[in-house]
């Protein structure tokens, strides 16, 4: 089904609005994928907050014109699925992870921070841990010195408490022997 001019303008406007909110673009060729596989990919993308859309390349080029993703226009050829995300790595991660399990989805490239990325660049971007994991690791780094200090102080207190307890036991024993002798 072909789109008339108004429909095309609406598609370009919708994609351009998504592009304006996104940090990352991932491109993949979907030739040979079954409908079930595409549905699975779309479901995964939705769960991760990734806008995934099959577009005519001409419309995609118009949507990214004048944006940070314009540099990826050279990679826009063939039957492509476009993944946009506000999260810096989500789109790349969804596409790369799906391509690992399905060889018919072929990575083509993408863009991040105004720079075009090749296949290796998209894979490298996807290998970065998620924001939540990075925050957890950072929190662990912040907590590590504090917990280490607390353990040292507890060990020091225990070390000082043991001789004090032994002295108290000896003093009690001395008092008991004096009372028994006296």
Curated annotation (Swiss-Prot):
Q: In the UniProt record, which is one GO cellular component term?
A: ribonucleoprotein complex
> Cross-referenced Gene3D superfamilies, in alphabetical order?
3.30.70.1730, 6.10.250.290
By its UniProt entry, which Pfam families does this protein fall under? Ribosomal_L10 (PF00466)
Q: Which CDD domains match?
A: Ribosomal_L10
**GO BP annotations listed:** translation
Record's superkingdom? Answer: Bacteria
Q: Which residues cross the membrane?
A: none
Mention one GO molecular function.
Answer: large ribosomal subunit rRNA binding
Which of UniProt's keywords are assigned here? Ribonucleoprotein, Ribosomal protein, RNA-binding, rRNA-binding
Subunit comment for this entry?
A: Part of the ribosomal stalk of the 50S ribosomal subunit. The N-terminus interacts with L11 and the large rRNA to form the base of the stalk. The C-terminus forms an elongated spine to which L12 dimers bind in a sequential fashion forming a multimeric L10(L12)X complex.
Q: What does this protein do?
A: Forms part of the ribosomal stalk, playing a central role in the interaction of the ribosome with GTP-bound translation factors.
The entry's family comment says: Belongs to the universal ribosomal protein uL10 family.
Designated name of the protein:
Large ribosomal subunit protein uL10
């Amino acid at each position: 089904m072909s789109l008339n001019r108004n429909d095309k303008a609406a598609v370009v406007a919708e994609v351009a609005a998504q592009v304006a909110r996104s940090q990352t673009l991932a491109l993949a060729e979907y030739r040979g994928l079954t409908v079930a596989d595409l549905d699975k990919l779309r479901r995964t993308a939705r769960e991760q907050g990734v806008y995934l859309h099959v577009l005519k390349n001409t419309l995609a080029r118009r949507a990214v014109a004048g944006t940070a993703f314009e540099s990826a226009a050279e990679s826009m050829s063939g039957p492509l699925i476009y993944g946009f995300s506000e999260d810096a790595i989500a789109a790349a991660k969804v596409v790369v992870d799906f391509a690992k399990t399905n060889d018919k989805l072929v990575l083509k490239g993408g863009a991040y921070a105004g720079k075009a990325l090749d296949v290796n660049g998209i894979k490298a971007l996807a290998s970065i841990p998620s924001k939540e994991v990075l925050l957890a690791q950072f929190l662990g780094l912040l907590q590590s010195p504090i917990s280490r200090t607390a353990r040292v102080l507890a060990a020091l207190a225990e070390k000082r408490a043991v001789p004090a307890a032994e002295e108290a036991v000896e003093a009690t024993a001395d008092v008991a022997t004096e009372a028994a002798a006296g």
